[in-house]
């Protein structure tokens, strides 16, 4: 079963992604985090336990403390995470936001509300 890490500071969006997973009956192990740092620490723990890497990580563009682009750039600089698909999501449809996400190393940019089946198609 594919593994998805989802990072968003909004409790509503964290609830929504799990709701959509159930509603769309998407076969995915979903792990949600409210901060970029929590997601990064979880990834490092997965490596230590030799559990493999998640297939996809999607992070919200705008979060306090560290943005989604900050997390993506951090993961791209670390070879241990080179095989993971990385995406940015946002309620923004601004071209500048999309370009900034891709420049940080994101493989794709998604507008909210999210379509979980569409995310998994990006594997």
Give names to the regions the model predicted.
Residues 32-56:
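Acidic, metal-coordinating helix/loop segments flanking the phosphotransfer/catalytic sites
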Residues 32, 65-66:
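Residue-level signal for the "D+5" position in two-component response regulator receiver
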Residues 114-123:
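C-terminal output helix
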Residues 2-21, 57:
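Conserved acidic segment of CheY-like receiver
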Residues 63-65, 94:
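The feature encodes the CheY-like receiver
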């Amino acid at each position: 079963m594919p593994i998805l890490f989802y990072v968003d500071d909004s409790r509503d969006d964290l609830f929504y992604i799990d709701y959509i997973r159930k509603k769309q009956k998407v076969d995915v192990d979903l792990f949600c985090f409210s901060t970029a740092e929590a997601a990064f620490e979880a990834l490092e723990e997965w490596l230590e336990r030799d559990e493999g890497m998640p297939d996809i990580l999607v992070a919200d563009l705008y979060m306090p403390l560290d943005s989604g682009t900050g997390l993506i750039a951090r993961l791209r600089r670390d070879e241990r995470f080179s095989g993971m698909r990385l995406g940015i999501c946002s309620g923004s449809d601004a071209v500048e936001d999309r370009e900034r996400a891709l420049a940080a190393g994101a493989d794709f940019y998604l507008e909210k509300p999210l379509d979980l089946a569409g995310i998994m198609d990006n594997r």
